């Protein structure tokens, strides 16, 4: 086991604080509408330019082990805020730094670290309750656009495109962000349920100009097995021929004689039919077939539940308004399933998302939920260069997370105003002693830090701006974008309540632990040339390093 270096008391805290300040100072320059960019060196490819706090934090590793511990703990604040709310990483870092700086001053002055931490915790609990009281629901498209615009560093085009996407696919819909090919941002919306399986034979194509299959008002047959014998399909096909309606077959596979017969019948115009493989594999395929069944009002024909394909009737089939099949995708539009059953299925999947511990499973479940609930929107980010593309894509992703958080828990006045107003209401939190009272004061001072940093980044005097805002009331605050004061809600400067809440809670949690640190332990770095010198008869090899 390698030898360790141990530092105690004030020496430990000073070195830890140095690391906190290095990381926080690099991150906080990005805060607010006039925040600056940070350039990150990459081992391959061009440097990355970003205004995303967590991206900056993740890049920072310090040479001094003890300083690095401080930096890593603040990095944890940014990462936690990013995981929970998807945004607010810079705010969380600024809050954490403010609490640590003031807290360590108090510890150096002889106050009890544990009481300081308890005071900070009490203030944060009271602040979270006040934030919830201050919060307003984010219901309309205009508010959604405003939240997205603020999170995307005042880029209105991003705000508008996210609001449009949310309007089209609903709150449960999936919105993904991709790198586009054009100079402008583009929005593609896939309505209905789409899965990544194309037609099993090009002979099903009935729209040669687009190379696709289009079926109007088709029946949908769902089978959880391979179909190779045409005899199994005959009862369904005979019943179908009488109705004159087309048929979509979704099965594990359709092959051999069965596929050949379907192709021949389709080409002769006897029965209009198309077959595709079922999406997914294993248990996920069963679940997705059931999703399609509920969406179309049909039944999955599966032998394990006692249903045989030969005995299936038209009543077991689902129906839809339209189906479009390309060589890669199948889209079912306006399935005729019962809305109550679809809603029940969506809430069931939502429950599974909450219980799942795997990020991959969560993502797949959310995709299924979106396909049932509304659809999928793809925002294609456009830019002139790859460097700009990456920076813009990160901002779009942040804005998207912030918007979801706003829909979930509502919005509060932005620009750091919400925390200033909350701080003024919780000054008289009950405490047991003077040290705890000072802990509350530390938290209240820290709550001004985001507003002060926004003002500093805008080139203004932070104390003047903070006092002007504190002397106001309600939603009155400072708009750094155009250097004016006024009602933040009327000016459209909104922050998601969840983002502000998570930033405060995570910052206080980790900063409180740092204040109570009394000793730090780290490995003593070993000299590489000394390591080589220990090899018998090869002492001279040290110079080769």
From Swiss-Prot:
EC category name: isomerase
GO MF annotation list: ATP binding; ATP-dependent protein folding chaperone; isomerase activity; unfolded protein binding
Binding site for ATP: 30-33, 51, 87-91, 415, 495
Gene3D superfamilies for this protein: GroEL (3.50.7.10), GroEL-like equatorial domain (1.10.560.10), TCP-1-like chaperonin intermediate domain (3.30.260.10)
Tagged with keyword Heme: no
Documented EC number(s): 5.6.1.7
Catalytic activity: ATP + H2O + a folded polypeptide = ADP + phosphate + an unfolded polypeptide
GO CC annotations on file: cytoplasm
UniProt entry tagged with the keyword Transport: no
A Gene Ontology biological process term: protein refolding
SUPFAM superfamilies noted in UniProt: GroEL apical domain-like, GroEL equatorial domain-like
The entry's keywords: ATP-binding, Chaperone, Cytoplasm, Isomerase, Nucleotide-binding
UniProt subcellular location: Cytoplasm
Main location: cytoplasm
PROSITE patterns to which the protein is assigned, alphabetical: CHAPERONINS_CPN60
Function summary: Together with its co-chaperonin GroES, plays an essential role in assisting protein folding. The GroEL-GroES system forms a nano-cage that allows encapsulation of the non-native substrate proteins and provides a physical environment optimized to promote and accelerate protein folding.
Family per record: Belongs to the chaperonin (HSP60) family.
NCBIfam families: GroEL (TIGR02348), PRK00013.1 (NF000592), PRK12849.1 (NF009487), PRK12850.1 (NF009488), PRK12851.1 (NF009489)
Description of how the protein assembles with itself and partners: Forms a cylinder of 14 subunits composed of two heptameric rings stacked back-to-back. Interacts with the co-chaperonin GroES.
Protein name: Chaperonin GroEL
């Amino acid at each position: 086991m390698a030898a360790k270096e141990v530092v105690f008391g004030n020496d430990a805290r000073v070195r830890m604080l140095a690391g906190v300040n290095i990381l926080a100072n690099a991150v906080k320059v990005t805060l607010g509408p006039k925040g600056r960019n940070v350039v990150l060196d990459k081992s391959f490819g061009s440097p990355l330019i970003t205004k995303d706090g967590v991206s900056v934090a993740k890049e920072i590793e310090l040479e001094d082990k003890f300083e690095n511990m401080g930096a890593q703990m603040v990095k944890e604040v940014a990462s936690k805020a990013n995981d929970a709310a998807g945004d607010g990483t810079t705010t969380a870092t600024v809050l954490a730094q403010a609490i640590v700086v003031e807290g360590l001053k108090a510890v150096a002055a002889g106050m009890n670290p544990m009481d300081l931490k308890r005071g900070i915790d009490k203030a944060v609990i009271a602040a979270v309750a006040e934030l919830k009281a201050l919060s307003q629901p984010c219901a309309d498209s205009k508010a959604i656009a405003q939240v997205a615009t603020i999170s995307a560093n005042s880029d209105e085009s991003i705000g508008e495109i996210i609001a449009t996407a949310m309007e089209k696919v609903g709150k449960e819909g999936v919105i993904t962000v991709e790198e586009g090919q054009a100079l402008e941002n583009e929005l593609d919306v896939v309505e209905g349920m789409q899965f990544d399986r194309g037609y099993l034979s090009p002979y099903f194509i009935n729209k040669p100009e687009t190379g696709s299959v289009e079926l109007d008002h088709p029946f949908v047959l769902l089978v959880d097995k391979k179909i190779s014998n045409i005899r199994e399909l005959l009862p369904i096909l005979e019943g179908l021929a009488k109705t004159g309606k087309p048929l979509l077959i979704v099965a594990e596979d359709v092959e051999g004689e069965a596929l050949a017969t379907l192709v021949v019948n389709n080409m002769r115009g006897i029965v209009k039919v198309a077959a595709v493989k079922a999406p997914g594999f294993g248990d996920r395929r069963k679940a997705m077939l059931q999703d399609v069944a509920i969406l179309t009002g049909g039944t999955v024909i599966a032998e394990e539940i006692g249903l045989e394909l030969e005995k299936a009737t038209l009543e077991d089939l689902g129906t839809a308004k339209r189906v479009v099949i390309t060589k890669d995708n199948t889209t079912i539009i306006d399935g005729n399933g019962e809305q109550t059953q679809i809603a029940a299925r969506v809430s069931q999947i939502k429950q599974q998302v909450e219980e799942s511990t795997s990020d991959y499973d969560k993502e797949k479940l959310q995709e299924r939920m979106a396909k049932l609930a509304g659809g999928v929107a793809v925002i294609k980010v456009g830019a002139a260069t790859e460097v700009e593309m990456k920076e813009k894509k990160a901002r779009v992703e942040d804005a998207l997370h912030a918007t979801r958080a706003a829909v979930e828990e509502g919005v509060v006045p932005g620009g750091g105003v919400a925390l200033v107003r909350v701080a003024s209401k919780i000054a008289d939190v009950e405490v047991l002693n003077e040290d705890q009272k000072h802990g509350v004061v530390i938290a209240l001072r820290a709550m001004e830090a985001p507003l002060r940093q926004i003002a500093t980044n805008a080139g203004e005097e932070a104390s003047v701006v903070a006092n002007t805002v504190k002397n106001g009331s309600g939603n009155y605050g400072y708009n750094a974008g155009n250097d004016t004061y006024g009602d933040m809600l009327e000016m459209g400067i909104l922050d998601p309540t969840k983002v502000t809440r998570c930033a405060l809670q995570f910052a206080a949690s980790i900063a409180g632990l740092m204040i109570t640190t009394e000793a730090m332990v780290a490995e003593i770095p070993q000299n590489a040339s000394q390591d080589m010198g220990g090899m018998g008869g090869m002492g001279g090899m040290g110079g080769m390093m």
